[in-house]
């Protein structure tokens, strides 16, 4: 990802592709963003429209589904990049205007840029622009973001759909967690220490008493 973003910076599209990898927006949603959609102070991005191509013309329409209308929290670094990008064209309401037309980017043009970035970064995998959305989701789950939160960020209609989509990731994480728990249980049983006293009845949750090892 580091090499990919370096190439995006060279190409002059770092803010756009950084935002994509840190928010997982759909391509049309990303291209339809306007400056007024960003709350700089709260670091919140409002997603409520998309760019599509209909009969050869670019058109701004409502999002894919009602769940696609959402607010997405951003990192400070992402906000800083967006502010810097806007300062280059302060009179244009579009967050990512096409340098050629000043209007919205064509979805196909952005996909072609993605291929160029991949090639220049030496990434041989066939990564479509939509796969950047999957990359974000994979990083989020691997970083410990719960599925319900991720689902709302992606604009999915249910957490169950998100879980089904990324079940291979959560399965790997579960196996990793099982190994950690197994190692912990082995160390506990090997220690053969006496059980600590029972916790008070008013405890909010009940667990099998254990002694912290290490």
Where are the language model's segments positioned?
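Basic, Lys/Arg- and aromatic-enriched nucleic-acid-binding interface segment
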Residues: 1-33, 40-41, 69, 77, ...
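Short, basic (Lys/Arg/His-rich) helix/loop patches that form interaction surfaces
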Residues: 3-14, 23, 72, 84-104, ...
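C-terminal secondary-structure termini that scaffold catalytic or DNA-interacting sites
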Residues: 42, 55-80, 84, 100, ...
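A general lysine-centric signal
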Residues: 49, 64-66, 148
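Short, small-residue-rich loop/turn micro-motifs
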Residues: 49-51, 78, 86, 154
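Catalytic-site neighborhood detector that most strongly recognizes the C-terminal catalytic loop/helix
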Residues: 51, 154-180
């Amino acid at each position: 990802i580091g090499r990919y973003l370096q190439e995006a910076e060279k190409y002059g599209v770092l803010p756009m592709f950084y935002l994509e990898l840190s928010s997982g927006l759909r391509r049309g949603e990303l291209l339809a963003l306007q400056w007024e959609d960003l709350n700089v102070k709260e670091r919140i991005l409002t997603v409520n429209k998309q760019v599509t191509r209909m009969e050869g013309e670019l058109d701004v329409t409502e999002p894919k589904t009602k769940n696609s209308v959402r607010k997405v929290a951003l990192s400070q670094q992402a906000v800083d990049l967006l502010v810097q990008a806007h300062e280059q064209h302060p009179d244009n309401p579009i967050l990512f205007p096409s340098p050629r037309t000043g209007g919205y980017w064509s979805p196909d043009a952005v996909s072609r840029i993605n291929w160029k970035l991949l090639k220049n970064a030496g990434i041989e995998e066939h990564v479509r622009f939509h796969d950047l959305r999957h990359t974000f989701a994979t990083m989020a789950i691997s970083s410990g973001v719960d599925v319900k939160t991720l689902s709302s960020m992606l604009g999915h209609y249910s957490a169950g759909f998100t879980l089904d989509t990324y079940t291979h990731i959560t399965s790997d994480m579960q196996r990793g967690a099982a190994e950690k728990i197994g190692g912990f249980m082995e160390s506990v049983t090997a220690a053969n220490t006496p059980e600590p006293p029972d916790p008070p009845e008013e405890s909010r949750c009940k667990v099998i008493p254990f002694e912290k090892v290490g």
